[in-house]
């Protein structure tokens, strides 16, 4: 029989007592009282914070939105069908955050920052809160650097600056997304990180956008955040905030970011759905009372930081879809009053072949002109004036047939100016080319061309300058202003290009 050694047992017990650690895991938990339509009512978590992340069973997260006296109304971010009444809910004691950093570039993520592009996990140890207070007045500086879109109609007459919020507004199928995507493509090599947030769109449409960005080499500096039409309303509601949080990382590191929200009408509809399910009192058009704050707190985060904070910026291009051109509806008027201007796209212009279909009369940029380069201001000011006069005369000329020579000449020039502002999709132009063709139009150098020949001539002009006088484009880019010598050189080159173009046309007709 084995002998029991008391000293060994004592030694063993002593070592176990010495190494004993008293660990008590304390979680604040509540109970699901009712669940349905992506909304859970939870009892027992009295000390929860507004907007706090809650842990539900089966790995589903929720956000505490309604803090009532005896219960908490939470919205669920994911598949909630497996959650049932009586399930346990834990507090996480943290506000929702998304992963940020260099690893996000080139990726397609959902509203929680999780990758959905089958390219593996995103490896980063940096996180930004989804909701964040916008920079204060002292932390900002005025908009003074241009943010080129590559579109003649916008860069010349409605310029956008870094740190600006410029609304793109119009009916469905007027080219709103195309304007935003042209801006992304034009940002190549300009030290700009682009964040495209797709809210409530068809997945096929988003896949098309991603494919187009890849084909144009734009995914190398872009991030796509997706909350599609099939995602729960809470995901569509937080997607723009997640996109901004991702962009803020680049702004805070002294770089420049562009945020496109496509579109905020669907985010407002998702927020209305959540609010009505949470039994918040409805207001105008059934939207809750704080729907203005929904968009203002989002768009105020786009800013140009002071040099002391690194001088980084976020430029916002929110998109709003109108119904039958009604810009006086609730959400459009809200966002117009928050932003620094709007680009209004019109169905009639789009259908008549004017693309981008920018209505220059209703579009405005409230701060962009202080950011525009001098050369663009020089040609853009006269362009806007001549187009305004043309529209007035065009409306007037419908009533009378006998027009004097001056009026007829102005109408003819207006037709050519409308023609030079047309541009093919995904063909953004550098400032130098835009300035050259607008200079030609506003100085009457295209008046003797047929209207149908204006666009073919524009293409021929760029080719001629690049082969015969490439220094012209370089000089405009470097000096950023037009002096008499540059104007004389431009006039001479444009006239030479026109002579060659007309002689080529004549020869082609003779040969035919």
Curated annotation (Swiss-Prot):
**What topology does it adopt in the membrane?**
Peripheral membrane protein
**Name listed for the protein in its UniProt record:** ATP synthase subunit alpha
What lineage does UniProt assign to this protein's organism? Bacteria, Pseudomonadati, Acidobacteriota, Terriglobia, Terriglobales
List residues binding ATP.
170-177
Principal localization? membrane
Q: Name one GO molecular function term.
A: ADP binding
Q: State the oligomer form and interacting partners.
A: F-type ATPases have 2 components, CF(1) - the catalytic core - and CF(0) - the membrane proton channel. CF(1) has five subunits: alpha(3), beta(3), gamma(1), delta(1), epsilon(1). CF(0) has three main subunits: a(1), b(2) and c(9-12). The alpha and beta chains form an alternating ring which encloses part of the gamma chain. CF(1) is attached to CF(0) by a central stalk formed by the gamma and epsilon chains, while a peripheral stalk is formed by the delta and b chains.
EC number(s) of the enzyme? 7.1.2.2
Q: Where in the cell is it found?
A: Cell inner membrane
Q: Catalyses which reaction?
A: ATP + H2O + 4 H(+)(in) = ADP + phosphate + 5 H(+)(out)
Q: Does the keyword tRNA processing apply?
A: no
Q: Where is this site: Required for activity?
A: 363
Check the record and name the InterPro entries matching this protein: ATP_synth_asu-like_sf, ATP_synth_asu_C, ATP_synth_asu_C_sf, ATP_synth_F1_a_nt-bd_dom, ATP_synth_F1_asu, ATPase_a/bsu_AS, ATPase_F1/V1/A1_a/bsu_N, ATPase_F1/V1/A1_a/bsu_N_sf
Family indicated by similarity: Belongs to the ATPase alpha/beta chains family.
